């Protein structure tokens, strides 16, 4: 099924969603477009203005512009915006992360307003970045929004729980099968299923790119489909297009590192991408895991080194 075209979409009640373009841009990873739309759109109520600001500041977080979020969201701001600020604070200040998680645990142990979808999403994001997917899933299961379900699917797929991800996708499709988020989640699940579903996943990423914009998220999705089908050279071309858009994008660089191995590229090519990733994202989980494996290898090598 084709994804929705950009424009004002109607909800089930027939009402036009004034923030459709803002949300759609965010969901496909077109963060600057999301910011531009958010600054341009005229809204009918203060509640919608808060919702707009949530997406505006989340887009700044996605661009790693944490200072904007921390400076502009005040103690007097709405609870939804406080939740966004918490996530920005967690990402921006590494030495405060443990304290932020402790405070979040305290808040989760009290009565949580489950209608505050933004809080659930931001809390789950903190937990997931803190290597606690179980807490993230428990948090998301308290919400029933498409975005909570989409994030649940992402986490389940990272945990290799395709069975549970498919059940969650069915719930999304029952709620709104034409929504951009549902289309993306369908592509993620199809990518995990593999086989003939890979082409279906590719078509979703391609159609969204054609109708909206070929973002880094969509290009990496297309490249993953090509790679899973053994089309390594085609995947490399798509990833190079993504790299042209952002030379420090972590997912693109990680995919190029993996791809270089499959294509038998010289070691210096792989090392170049690895250096770019280290420069831009020194604390990225991939880098931490890579360095841990390097240390393990060095330790093993010492054990088998010839004695003098």
UniProtKB/Swiss-Prot annotation:
GO terms for molecular function: structural molecule activity. The modification Phosphoserine is found at residues 13, 45. It is found in: Cytoplasm; Golgi apparatus membrane; Cytoplasmic vesicle, COPI-coated vesicle membrane. The keyword Protein transport applies. Gene3D superfamilies: Tetratricopeptide repeat domain. GO terms for cellular component: COPI vesicle coat; Golgi membrane; nucleoplasm. Pfam families: Coatomer_E. One of its GO terms (biological process) is intra-Golgi vesicle-mediated transport. InterPro entries: Coatomer_esu, TPR-like_helical_dom_sf. Keywords: Cytoplasm, Cytoplasmic vesicle, ER-Golgi transport, Golgi apparatus, Membrane, Phosphoprotein, Protein transport, Transport, Ubl conjugation. Polyubiquitinated by RCHY1 in the presence of androgen, leading to proteasomal degradation. It is a peripheral membrane protein. The coatomer is a cytosolic protein complex that binds to dilysine motifs and reversibly associates with Golgi non-clathrin-coated vesicles, which further mediate biosynthetic protein transport from the ER, via the Golgi up to the trans Golgi network. The coatomer complex is required for budding from Golgi membranes, and is essential for the retrograde Golgi-to-ER transport of dilysine-tagged proteins. Belongs to the COPE family. Oligomeric complex that consists of at least the alpha, beta, beta', gamma, delta, epsilon and zeta subunits. This is Coatomer subunit epsilon. It comes from Cricetulus griseus.
């Amino acid at each position: 099924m084709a994804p929705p075209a950009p424009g004002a979409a109607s909800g089930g009640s027939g009402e036009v969603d004034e923030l459709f373009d803002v949300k759609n841009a965010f969901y496909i990873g077109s963060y600057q477009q999301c910011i531009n739309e958010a600054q341009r759109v005229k809204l009918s109520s203060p509640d919608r203005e808060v919702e707009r600001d949530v997406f505006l500041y989340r887009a700044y977080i996605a661009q790693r512009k944490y200072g904007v979020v921390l400076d502009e969201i005040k103690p007097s701001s709405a609870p939804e915006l406080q939740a966004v600020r918490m996530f920005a604070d967690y990402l921006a200040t590494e030495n405060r992360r443990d304290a932020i998680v402790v405070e979040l645990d305290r808040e989760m142990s009290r009565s949580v307003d489950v209608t505050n979808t933004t809080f659930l999403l931001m809390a789950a994001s903190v937990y997931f970045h803190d290597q606690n997917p179980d807490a993230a899933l428990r948090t998301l299961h308290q919400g029933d929004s498409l975005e909570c379900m989409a994030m649940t699917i992402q986490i389940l797929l990272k945990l290799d729980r395709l069975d549970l991800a498919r059940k969650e996708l069915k719930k999304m499709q029952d709620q709104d099968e034409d929504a951009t988020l549902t289309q993306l989640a369908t592509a993620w699940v199809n990518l995990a299923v593999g086989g003939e579903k890979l082409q279906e996943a590719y078509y979703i990423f391609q159609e969204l790119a054609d109708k909206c914009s070929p973002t880094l998220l969509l290009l990496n999705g297309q490249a993953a489909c090509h790679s899973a089908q053994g089309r390594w050279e085609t995947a490399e071309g798509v990833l190079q297009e993504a790299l042209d858009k952002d030379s420090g994008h972590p997912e693109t660089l990680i995919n190029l590192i993996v791809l270089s191995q499959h294509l038998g590229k010289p070691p210096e090519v792989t090392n170049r991408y690895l250096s770019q990733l280290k420069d831009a994202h020194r604390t990225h989980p991939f880098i931490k895991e890579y360095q841990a494996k390097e240390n393990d290898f060095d330790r093993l090598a010492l054990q088998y080194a010839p004695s003098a």
